[in-house]
Amino acid sequence: MSKPWGGIGAWADEAERADEEQAAEATATAADSQSFPSLKEAATAKSSKKKKKMTLSEFTKGAYTAPSSAGLTREQMLQLPTGPRQRSEDEMQPGRLGGGFSSYGGGRSSGPPGRMSRDREDSDGSWGGGGGGRRSYGGFDDDQRGSNSRVSDFPQVSRADEDDDWGKGKKSLPSFDQGRQGSRYGGGGGSFGGGGGGGAGSYGGGGAGAGSGGGGGFSKADEVDNWAAGKAKSSTFGSGFRESGPEPDRWARGVLPSGGGVQEERRRLVFEPRKADTEVSETPTAVKTSKPSPFGAARPREQVLAEKGLDWKKLDSDIEAKKGQTSRPSSAQSSRPSSAQSNRSESSALNNVENVVKPRPKVNPFGDAKPREVLLEEQGKDWRKIDSELEHRRVDRPETEGERMLKEEIEELRKKLEKEAAIAPESKESQQESDSNHQNLPDLIREKEKNLDLLIRELDDKVRFRPRAVERPGSSASRGGSYSERPHSRAGSIDESRSVESMERPRSHGTGDNWPRPVDDRRNFQGSKERGFFNNRNFDRSSSAREGW
């Protein structure tokens, strides 16, 4: 009977067997991860110093290793499709959506087979129109569900590949009225999601399918270049609100015919020409007279002169000639009447013309005022003498001995002339002598007065235009020359350190003393401060020299 825990040493055999299995697994994993070793192995592995040798051609060309491509197995090859998938009858319906969209929008309405036929005579040309059109979005109006679906046109060839020149097969544009018969692109009423076969082209109309099967025939989209001309107004969603039809491009009276008849256009309105323009053109004077003229009854000067038989050009030339001889005409003397005179009547205009011929006298802006010289001459006074006396009064100076003597002589001659005129002549001889003396005295008086005036003018000019020495604050050389009238002080005295800028005081009458007076105390103070250091130094130097001597 075998023991349940096995024989002696069985655990050792199991341990060895487990070690062998682990070693086999380790070798297998090492072989797999040889190209990509782990970080630990890469860190522990030591690269040999001796590198592998290779030729230059092997280095340049490189060793080509073909990509290892694992092919498909037999089972996978058998599972691959060998043809198109077999479709059911529902999927083969014309308007059926494929893929995950097969159940979108509910059922489809029944219609003829074919994919979006080019010929849409019996069906609506817009989306979801009557007669087999596409169902409305989301499956509205589920009561009219049909089996209309798309046609599977996979084996068909595209017409774009058949024709190289697409413009050859393009039809000529139809007339505007033909394209309007019935509904646009073969439809009649209808709206989004609306029912009713043969409904007009609005989005989502229910009814029959959207196109006939097959690929033959031209589309009306190719016949019309301007699609916006027949565009219908977008209607509301759902079947609750419906429209009677598309909005027409031209207005028409009455109800539109539903049987596709030709619409009658409204007649053009023929307007008669406006009568107001003709009346205005025929009677322009009546319109002008309605507004009062700002110039009143005044007329141009040329017309007035022409009525009087005068040549206005000749009058203007005469006036200009007269003005050129006298002086430059002012603005008040212009040949044409001013704007202020234009509102007068014809008589006033003629008077103005006559007045214009005679130049107006110039008005003196000063009135009756006359110059001072003219008035003094009329009064018998000499204005030059008066001016000289006034100028002499402005100069403040004492009277000299020469002036006093000339004045006394003039006074004596005047008294003598008055006495001779007062005493009547007793004899003819005395009368002749008095006449000669009487003629000589006025000449002497005039000569004396002339000499006195010249003397006074010279003395006044000397006082007024006397040169004044301008002393600089730091110049000591000009100081001594400018104060020639000042009494000299002793050499080395303290007065040399004081500099007072002064000018000659005007002498009063009867006194000839000249007293200096300061001009600018502030300037004197600054000058004394500036020169104080140097003057004190010179003073110390002179005092030390005295002590040394």
From Swiss-Prot:
Signal peptide: none annotated. A motif (Nuclear localization signal 1) lies at residues 169-176. GO terms for molecular function: mRNA binding; protein homodimerization activity; translation initiation factor activity. Residues 24-46, 327-349 have a biased composition (Low complexity). Residues 1-446, 465-549 are annotated as: Disordered. A motif (Nuclear localization signal 2) lies at residues 234-241. Residues 96-109, 126-136, 184-218 have a biased composition (Gly residues). It comes from the Eukaryota. Residues 281-292 have a biased composition (Polar residues). Phosphorylated. Keywords: Initiation factor, Nucleus, Phosphoprotein, Protein biosynthesis. It is found in: Nucleus. Residues 263-278, 299-323, 369-431, 485-507, 518-549 have a biased composition (Basic and acidic residues). Belongs to the eIF-4 subunit B family. Over-expression in sns-D leads to programmed cell death (PCD) in the leaves characterized by spontaneous necrotic spots on the rosette leaves under aseptic conditions. Embryo lethal when homozygote. Homodimer. Nonspherical monomer. mRNA-discriminating component of initiation complexes. This is Eukaryotic translation initiation factor 4B2. It comes from Arabidopsis thaliana. The lineage of its organism: Eukaryota, Viridiplantae, Streptophyta, Embryophyta, Tracheophyta.
